[in-house]
Design a protein with these regions (language model features):
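Right-handed parallel beta-helix
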Residues: 1-11, 24-41, 53-77, 85-91, ...
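Extracellular beta-strand solenoids
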Residues: 16, 45, 89, 119-120, ...
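Short, contiguous acidic/charged loop-to-helix segments that flank catalytic cores in large enzymes
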Residues: 116, 141-147, 169-175
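Short, solvent-exposed loop/turn segments at secondary-structure boundaries
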Residues: 18, 54-58, 170
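Non-catalytic carbohydrate-binding regions of carbohydrate-active enzymes
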Residues: 137-141, 162, 166
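Acidic, glycine- and Ser/Thr-rich low-complexity intrinsically disordered tracts
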Residues: 59, 151, 155, 162, ...
Length: 246
């Protein structure tokens, strides 16, 4: 469990696993953290090699939960080849125990990245009820890294991005794998709202249109608590300065 930390200006905020995938990270809980202005990742969970038979290491399907965090790279991040997303999630075990493990992210705020996407992931993922704002580029990239995206659900998120809102690139899945990447019920204001995946019931509009729509109250509260600003998107809202839910 990683809970209630403030990490400001680090090289990498949270790094879980090992660069070669040899350090198991299983069934974690990461919640109520503020991670801002890192040089590299706010959070990186490395890909996993097949799970070793170690006493005490959970077997079967496990879920890692990432919830109620703020991940921001508004300042201080690397550019060029050294640029990194706010959050990168690697794949789980490719065979044996852990192949059905999933990483679930909900209730998080992903805020600004001048040089990269806000989120990148592969493996088994579920992203729901998060808020993404990037004035500079992409929000969500589901794409191969050390393996491929497997079963992925991007559901009910609010996304404002100058670049692509949700990008899905599947890579080459094993024959008969039947992996599915679903993009469902999101509200997306972006230069290119959705590119790839099985898309349904999404509300999409150009990036600039976000200025005319109210944002959720909880998003305003989360951002203002950490002294961020969404006034760019609120300045032209024809709703008397109110937010959704008031």
């Amino acid at each position: 469990m990683i809970r209630g930390n403030e990490i400001v200006g680090a090289g990498t905020g949270l790094y879980l696993g090992n660069s070669d995938g040899s350090a198991p990270f299983v069934g974690g809980l990461i919640e109520h953290n503020l991670v801002v202005d890192t040089i590299g990742y706010n959070l990186q969970i490395k890909h996993q090699r097949p799970r070793p038979d170690v006493p005490g290491l959970p077997a079967g399907k496990n879920v890692t939960i990432i919830r109620y965090n703020v991940f921001s790279k508004a300042r201080g991040g690397s550019s060029g080849p050294a640029a990194r997303p706010n959050v990168l999630i690697g794949h789980g075990s490719l065979y044996g125990p852990g192949t059905d493990d999933v990483t679930v992210l909900y209730g998080n705020v992903f805020h600004q990245n001048p040089a990269e996407a806000l989120f990148q992931g592969e493996g088994n993922l579920a992203l729901h009820g998060n808020q993404f704002v990037n004035d500079h580029g992409d929000a969500i990239r589901i794409q191969p890294h050390n393996d491929i995206p497997r079963n992925v659900d991007v559901l009910g998120n609010t996304i404002v991005a100058e670049g692509t809102g949700v990008l899905v690139r599947t890579g080459e899945a094993p024959a008969g794998a039947g992996f599915r990447q679903a993009v469902t019920g999101n509200v997306v204001f972006a230069g290119r709202p959705i590119d790839g995946g099985v898309s349904s019931a999404n509300t999409v509009a150009p990036f600039e249109a976000a200025a005319y729509y109210p944002v959720p109250c909880d998003f305003q509260f989360a951002i203002s608590n950490f002294q961020f600003s969404i006034r760019r998107f609120a300045s032209k809202r024809p709703v008397g300065g109110r937010c959704l839910g008031e």
